[in-house]
Amino acid sequence: MAKKVITREEEEVRELIRAEDLWEPVGPTPMPKITDLRNWDMRLLKTYKPWYAPFCDLCCLCTYGKCDLTEGRRGACGIDIATQQARIVLLACLMGCSAHAGHAGHILEYLIEKHGPDKKIDLGTFVELEAPNIRTVTGLKPETLGDLKRVIEYVYKEITHLLDSTNSGQEGNYLDYESKALHASMLDHVGMEVADIAQIVGFNFPSSVADTPLVDMGWTSVGKTKPVILVVGHNPGVSTNIIDYLQANKLYDKVEVCGICCTALETTRYADRAKVIGPLSRQLFYVRTGIADVIVTDEQCIRTDIAIEAKKVGSALIAGSDKACYGLPEVSEREADEIVKEMVEEGKQFLILDHELAGEVAVKVAMKLAPQRKKEFVTEKEAQEFAKKCKECGICEMVCPNLFSIGKSMADVAKGNFGKLREVFNKCIGCGKCEEECPRDVPIFKIMQVAASKETYKLRAGRGPVMDTEIRNVGAPLVLGTIPGVIALVGCSNYPDIEDVADMVDEFARRKYIVVLTGCAAMVAGMKKDEEGKTVYEKYPPDFDAGGVVNIGSCVANAHISGAAIKIANIFATLPIRANYELIADYILNRVGACGVAWGAMSQKAASIGTGFNRWGVPVVLGPHSSKYRRLYLSRKEEDDWTVMDGRTRQLVDTKEPSPEHLAYVCETKEKAMVTIPKLCIRKNDTPQGRSIKLNHYISLWKKYMGGGLPDDLHLFVRRKADIPIVFKKEVMAWLKEIGWEEKPALSLPTLIGTYPTKVKLEAVIH
């Protein structure tokens, strides 16, 4: 056989990843291009077929259109409706990936300017396997901030090629668009990892520690008597400089710094006296209270009318990112005091891209403006007068995404009854559509001030990567099934009920699952107290272990969750990860019992985060609004072929077991989610003891939330009698006998390697 010729492009990649470094041999896919992992994608999509729910039946992307794609029609360019939906999915994933990659690139450039490119990456004593996503995808072991720049430039390059494919007259097959969406979303996890590692190193965020501080959360955790600075977004470049300026000028105890969305989480990782108002759903409500003297925005998940809303209530506003300029003049070349004077005396709003200057200006404006402003909550009497304007026309209820009884609540408030409105506020996702559409201009969000809970909650500050020592402790129990699974609650706050997340965390932590959280989900998990007045962060230990509840951090910290799954393959199973994506993803799919839950997913970022988990082989449960993403990855249960390779016997085995059953699945109710999540943690590699534990949870949760009886698909997950939980054995055996259940084939080492064309050798899966 002729020796393979290494191309110039391959040589460049080998140079970029320092292929001569001998920490591991370079695997088959260093810095993979769009088609390098296509066969893996197609194998996944063979089992987990895309299921489309078109949000729109038209294509309006080019001047040939509009084109009606219903009833088998094709557009003027030849595209069909499935391919059009897949293209929109790819565009959404690219938006999400670009948001995180842009964040990563920006914060990386800032920190390189501050510390230099040779700043060493050190994630603490207990994290030796840093950057598992970067290592597995690119083949590079990053040692400095400068190395991270190599990685993010690879991500930028791939994004360009992927976006190219969405132009008119390009890709014509829906499965290939799905493969590209999976590729974009894999890159998203790489970009997120770059961002959070850079932040940990550059800002000295917590790492190699589980017991991070408990910080205050809630809209009344912030005092009205002090100057208040509200930071909104995801990029901590400005917020950390606000803290630095306060500390340098001995003002730290004289000014309140609080946040909404992930900048809040990042700021509490930097300073535990900072406070969290809450998730995205609390943004409009809190801005309209007028409590913030200065609002500082950066990027992502910020209301695009925030400058207008700030002006209405007399809050000063500084935009701190080129991603969201709001039409404001950029003043980084001007003196701080000159900017402050115009903001305080003339009410001007500015774009300030110099983070240090923005931090200084924010503090000075807050201290000058606060004494001039009257901050008062709406009284019950005022709320009653406002509510009397409501004529219960029902328009607010029609436009509410969750169909809440807003009009009836207003009628009650007018009579002095606030109970119904309190229920509405607690579930409100903060979109503001009700007030926007009200024909009588009832100030619904102002009225909500009297109904909103005045309680302060506790949130554990984000802790960053899962430690290698923790992986060593839980690797075997997770793979064998005796720890029933890792549940990762992530994503935005577009919930049907905001308390659902806390209920899920409590249910699964109590059952000794490992529960990890990020972003808005991490916040809302702490916004419910039990009978003893404790949140889940006070009730459960912060360890990555059975029964632990772990706040990993912000949106970009999601990379540490996928990273933990990779670490299990490397640290526990000793599989080589360097440029070895397929091998590791195959291991995770077949042997690591993990399930993501994006219960309030709203943004394109949430779409790419979830799809990135899917490519790794981790299923994701989505909330009811997520059907609007247009696409799910569903199996057909018994109808599908569940044949895998037994890596030890080298024989194909029809397992007859749909595990995991789906990769992306929408649940319409919390109750349905409660029984779906444990089922999606079932893996073919489970030992009889592990499977028995998992089925015990599946059955007991079914009885608790679905009205009793046994799950109608239980027989699909019982391989042998030893899998049946002892407590339900008599009931299950009687039912299995009734339906004619038969034992399933034995399997020693499940893998998809060998069932599709791949460069990965079957021997590689044996460890």
In which residue ranges do the predicted regions lie?
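Metallocofactor- and cofactor-centric catalytic cores in central/energy metabolism, strongly enriched
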Residues: 2-440, 444-767
